[in-house]
Amino acid sequence: MGISFSIPFDPCVNKVSQWLDMKGSYTHNLEKNLVALETTMEELKAKRDDLLRRLKREEDRGLQRLSEFQVWLNRVATVEDIIITLLRDRDVEIQRLCLCRFCSKNLTTSYRYGKSVFLRLREVEKLKGEVFGVITEQASTSAFEERPLQPTIVGQKKMLDKAWKHLMEDGTGIMGMYGMGGVGKTTLLTQLFNMFNKDKCGFDIGIWVVVSQEVNVEKIQDEIAQKLGLGGHEWTQRDISQKGVHLFNFLKNKKFVLFLDDLWDKVELANIGVPDPRTQKGCKLAFTSRSLNVCTSMGDEEPMEVQCLEENVAFDLFQKKVGQKTLGSDPGIPQLARIVAKKCCGLPLALNVIGETMSCKRTIQEWRNAIHVLNSYAAEFIGMEDKILPLLKYSYDNLKGEHVKSSLLYCALYPEDAKIRKEDLIEHWICEEIIDGSEGIEKAEDKGYDIIGSLVRASLLMECVDLKGKSSVIMHDVVREMALWIASELGIQKEAFIVRAGVGVREIPKVKNWNVVRRMSLMGNKIHHLVGSYECMELTTLLLGEGEYGSIWRWSEIKTISSEFFNCMPKLAVLDLSHNQSLFELPEEISNLVSLKYLNLSHTGIRHLSKGIQELKKIIHLNLEHTSKLESIDGISSLHNLKVLKLYGSRLPWDLNTVKELETLEHLEILTTTIDPRAKQFLSSHRLMSRSRLLQIFGSNIFSPDRQLESLSVSTDKLREFEIMCCSISEIKMGGICNFLSLVDVTIYNCEGLRELTFLIFAPKLRSLSVVDAKDLEDIINEEKACEGEDSGIVPFPELKYLNLDDLPKLKNIYRRPLPFLCLEKITIGECPNLRKLPLDSRSGKQGENGCIIHYKDSRWLKGVKWADEATKKRFLPSCEHRLERCETIFED
């Protein structure tokens, strides 16, 4: 009988069954779960896409997505990536299954895969089941946030008030402010921004963006978005175009003020996504730039110039920076402080930096030394090289082209505060080959004026007129120091540019290494004798002439030049010896200047062209104007490449040989001359007349028969300035309709017999007309002779700016009917007792705040004026000003 026993199987079977139900289903139901996962994921994606389209519509209205919804989107994106991987491995995993999918060739792998499919299916179903009634909210923005501000610049209150008033005008959508670096533009813009912070003025948002040199559209968009509360992960996923659309849709329903600081180039508002404030009612754009060009390109045709401070205001700012303790430490310091402050020329940046530097200097010696450093080489002054000059250098670096940069550096050769004639600058640039003159002088001049315009618009030069009314520019002292610093390779090679202009030196300065000197300016000094030889192998420009300082003109005093002085200057291209009145001759050794292209001997005592000058074969520009002792120019025909010859005011006797010799100069393009009425050989020379840019006919003795000139026929389209003085002449004949297309300035003085000036009808570009002491003149434009012009549709004086009439006892008529005079700024009437009617009506003359004014000498004349109508009288009578001084032409001797 054997032993019997029993084992209970039910618990084991239950455990296996539970495992198969829970774990085995991962593999057994894999195919079914995969189908369900794929279907449910497609439904989830459809729901997500529907919500994203809704989101875009709401964000385009300026709403901001909820963080909760963004978390849901992120979870959908994460699970989608996982499911893509799972579905990619589907076929491989199904093929592993066996025994009716209850088993697998690799049980562990199939189990893990099946479990992952099951869990993802549950997650997708959960995500799909979430409901979003709201997915966005209003973006949270701060209307204005006050910006930190440097202490208000003394003296800018008036400018700030003007800017605020202009910006707040209903018609102002865009306002630009321009000026040189360091003048206070950013301070002014910040003050405007903070004024909006205090008084919102009905605006929803104020936005401040610093743009700087490299315009980065996306960077600007990001800064605006951050201000508007539109940033975040979703913002960074957009490209520039999408960001622009988003910003535009947000801002188009807002009243905003956008402040852009430090623009160097035009910024396309449309590309950024900013609605145009000129068409978006109630919106404003205010910006700063160093460039007038940028302001106009941004849409502000009349931007506000931020100028340097006036002298007294500048000194107030300087005193604040220095401090009363330092100013009161020695009785002599305040006077020296004013000298130092003046060196800053009203530039707030320089006043602040130099004022802070001097705030601890409490001895006379320290202040005197500061003045010495600023006068000799200002870049060495503490704070200049690290705080002032680099800031200004940004403007230099932003200039387009090396020729423009070189042109600016050239201006630093002139004295401080000098009024530099544009014409002189351009002549030097051409002969130094900064400007290409191969296509002719006039085209090169046009390039030069374009360069000057770009430098003015970049706030690196300022336009003005000199003492003789010539168009000129001034270089701010601090800009000049910056240019000298750059020219010296940032202070490394200080002797590259030797500039001692107008400082009273009596001899050539001492230089350690003459071989590195490229340009030297000793204008307006007290050097009497140029002696010795200097090895200036790289010297290209040597300026030894005059200089104009504000309202003062300083002449040079050179009397003699030694024979060896020019021996070692093989590259010298520009030599200016003008205004050395006691210089009567040049050494024959001037012929050693084998590269010389420009020679200025105007206002010197030169009597003739030396043999040495005749051997200057490369010379293209020779200036002999106002050489009152010049007896002949024999030998000038040897200067085969001469293109510009200036003889105005030279009193050169014009004989037949002189005319013939000049006619042999085949490359001559420009001629300026003074002739006497007898010089008929010159007047009959078509070659010389056609090249004349300035022609003066001057009778030397009013009682001499030599001054008789029965009639004059001038036919040249190059003539720009025309003067007739001290002559008896009955008529200036009219030529063809294109005779005087370039004529801009006409002066007639002390001429008998002349009854009318109808030839002027053929001068459409005439800007200045001065007629003084013409006893027989009856008409400016004679009615009968003008008929020919009127038949051609000509309206006289379309560009006339200045009209000066004096000592004309018989003058009755300027023109028989009113003229537009669109450019007319000033009429001056002296002794003209019979001139009772002016050719004006209520629409004539320059309009606006600086409209046409009338100066008159005799109050009886004004009482007798017959105005065209009451409207004309109302328009011009308030602008009439009584002037007692004699109205007469000023001309150079």
UniProtKB/Swiss-Prot annotation:
Listed under GO biological process in this entry are: defense response
Q: Which SUPFAM superfamilies match?
A: L domain-like (SSF52058), P-loop containing nucleoside triphosphate hydrolases (SSF52540)
Keyword Nucleotide-binding in record: yes
Q: LRR repeats span which residues?
A: 516-537, 538-559, 571-593, 595-617, 618-640, 641-663
Query: What lineage does the source organism belong to?
Result: Eukaryota, Viridiplantae, Streptophyta, Embryophyta, Tracheophyta
Domain NB-ARC residues, every copy: 136-440
- One CC-aspect GO term: nucleus
Q: What is known of its domains?
A: The LRR repeats probably act as specificity determinant of pathogen recognition.
Q: Which PANTHER family match?
A: NB-ARC DOMAIN-CONTAINING PROTEIN, NB-ARC DOMAIN-CONTAINING PROTEIN-RELATED
Q: What does this protein do?
A: Probable disease resistance protein.
- Highest taxon listed in the record's lineage: Eukaryota
Record's keyword terms, sorted: ATP-binding, Coiled coil, Leucine-rich repeat, Nucleotide-binding, Plant defense, Repeat
Tell me the organism.
Arabidopsis thaliana (Mouse-ear cress)
Xref: Pfam families: LRR_14 (PF23598), NB-ARC (PF00931), WH_DRP (PF23559)
Listed GO molecular functions? ADP binding; ATP binding
Q: What is this protein called?
A: Probable disease resistance protein At1g62630
Family recorded in the similarity comment: Belongs to the disease resistance NB-LRR family.
Task: Give start-end ranges for the coiled-coil region(s).
Answer: 24-68
User: Which residues does the record give as ATP binding sites?
Assistant: G179, M180, G181, G182, V183, G184, K185, T186
Q: Which InterPro entries match?
A: Apaf_helical, LRR_dom_sf, LRR_R13L4/SHOC2-like, NB-ARC, P-loop_NTPase, Plant_NBS-LRR, WH-like_DNA-bd_sf
